[in-house]
């Protein structure tokens, strides 16, 4: 971000929390698709919003970062994690 800012390039990131995907579904959810596994329950217990993320949850942060409202924002990471960062993690 510091090297590209003089060129007018903003460098930011979104740090998603726990989202259920094909890659991690077996770790977070039982085969019924509704019941969290022991690990999934541990993650949810450390997530103040007590749910996994949905793809649409990322849209607000993304829309902000690409909007004129973020024209003076660079070098930042926006967590979209249901408050997970507020805890020490798993």
Describe the predicted segments one by one:
Residues 6, 18-46, 87-90:
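A glycine/serine/threonine-rich, flexible loop-to-helix segment
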Residues 5, 10, 73-75:
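Short, small/polar-rich loop/turn modules that mediate ligand/substrate recognition or access, typified
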Residues 63, 74-90:
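Short C-terminal tail/terminal secondary-structure segment
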Residues 10-20, 66, 79-81:
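Conserved SDR Rossmann-fold cofactor-binding beta-strand/turn motif
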Residues 1, 13, 53, 59-61, ...:
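Small-residue (primarily alanine) positions within well-ordered alpha-helices
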Residues 34-35, 47-58, 69:
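A conserved structural motif in NAD(P)-dependent oxidoreductases
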Residues 2-6, 19, 53, 66:
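A short hydrophobic alpha-helix cap/turn motif
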């Amino acid at each position: 971000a510091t090297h590209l800012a003089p060129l007018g390039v903003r460098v930011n990131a979104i740090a998603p929390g726990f989202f259920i995907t094909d890659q991690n579904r077996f770790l977070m959810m039982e085969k019924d698709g509704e019941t969290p596994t022991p690990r999934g329950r541990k993650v949810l217990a450390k997530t103040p919003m007590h749910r996994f993320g949905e793809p649409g949850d990322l849209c607000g942060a993304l829309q902000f970062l690409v909007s004129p409202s973020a024209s003076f924002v660079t070098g930042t990471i926006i967590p979209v994690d249901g408050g997970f960062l507020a805890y020490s993690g798993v």
